């Protein structure tokens, strides 16, 4: 099980890649070149593998193993003192639900539990007419500030956080650090005037 964290665009985003994906240290990523494909699959027939340009709605994607949720829950979000978690859907009717201070878990895995962020429900329909709702988080200055705070704390508390590295080795502090760095870079590349064109989507 893992988290797929996306920045989705309301406009088409252009990419270049092979369409071949691998698991690397608990993350799923696309191989961008034929050389990378040959390195990972030296005995495979690559006749039908090509580097192509394509468009979708994905500006950014990070895949994180759920084994890192314990570590994420120990990363506080500076500037959110007094704010506590909202219940998830299955917790709404539980009388024993206990709100907790916000952590990176409530930013990366379940932003819908973060009351300081703005949320939106998108209504979707596939080619067969099936309808469904998608819960997303809007990108704004507060979200960017929280990601910056989480990345800063993660980068400066290696020794503390490495204690929560999973025993099975599937997922590491360095992986979480890299994901927060990459997410922050992607967010900072978006002009403030274009925030409305992008959304955060988390699939767990």
Region spans (language model):
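Acidic (Asp/Glu-rich) sequence patches and key acidic residues
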Residues: 1-204
